[in-house]
Amino acid sequence: MNLVPVDTDTHFAHLQQRLANADAAVRRVALVEFADVEDESLLPAIAAMLRRDPDPTLRAEAARALAGWGDGDVVDALADALCDAPQVRSAAALALTELKDPVAGERLVHRTRHTDAFVCAAVLRALRELRIAAAAEPASAALRHADAVVRREAIGVLGWLRHAPALPDLARRAQADADAEVRCAAVGALGLAAAEQAAAVLPALCAALRDAAWQVREEAATTLGKVAQARPLRAVACAALREAMEDDYWQVRLRAARSLGRLRDAEALPVLIEALAHRAGNLRKEAAIALGEVGDTRALAALSAASADPDPEVRKASRLAVQRLS
């Protein structure tokens, strides 16, 4: 059987011509073919399509097709598209999050100061996991942005960078930002505090355990277990976490129990044993695990009783805790 060799160059030349065809249906099929072959030589044509195609649906498709490519012109085209029609800018914003090359991401840093809040937020989101040091200063400035989404994305950048100079601003946001999601993000970012900085963020985290939004309290309970490992801080953190075991939301109690176990707080024995009888199985399971981590044999009787819990996960956690304490 004789196979006729395919002229790849000719095929790509035809594909490039079809990307600029007057018929939108032809251009759409060409875009689909590009997604299959992913030939780098076609990137300029796709970028041009993103910039100039009259059909916003196709511009959005072009943005999706460019996701993950770190070519400079592609990054610029996607960033420019953040000012396009809603469906295009959304596709471009998502495509930018797939950047993997920090060098390509550096082309975006100056756009964090754009006057459009959507652009600022999208660029900060794209920069987050790239961990570009140059993004720290504009992200810190963006903590004061009027738009809550921008502030939240700025916190994400600073958290991924583990940018210690931002801790005081993050502590203030954790307590006083008007938006609950921003407060929650700031509380989580305070977990980046190193041991020598933990004392400075502890008051903000304890205050966050009394936040009006239960999601913020939940995040605070988790973060306290991470940063309060040092003995001088542990007593303060554990006292606040024991109070959180009375929270109206079992989700907050669950995280508090987890942190109390992590901090091995023997004074938490009564509240953890009480949690073994809570209606939420997930909390009962976490309380059993925490009691095993605390390591106090006074919990053996309660854990033995919990080994007959109707929830199999609680039974398993309780039996493992009993083995650990025996």
Which residues fall in each region the model found?
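N-terminal alpha-helical scaffold/docking segments in eukaryotic complex subunits
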Residues: 1-60, 64, 68, 308, ...
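Ankyrin-repeat and related helical/solenoid repeat scaffolds used for protein-protein interactions
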Residues: 250, 254-317
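Core solenoid repeat modules with strong leucine/isoleucine-rich periodicity
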Residues: 87, 117, 122, 148-149, ...
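Short inter-helical turns and helix N-cap capping residues of alpha-solenoid HEAT/ARM repeat scaffolds
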Residues: 22-23, 54-55, 84-86, 115-116, ...
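Amphipathic alpha-helical scaffolding segments comprising HEAT/armadillo-like alpha-solenoid repeats
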Residues: 6-18, 39-52, 71-83, 101-113, ...
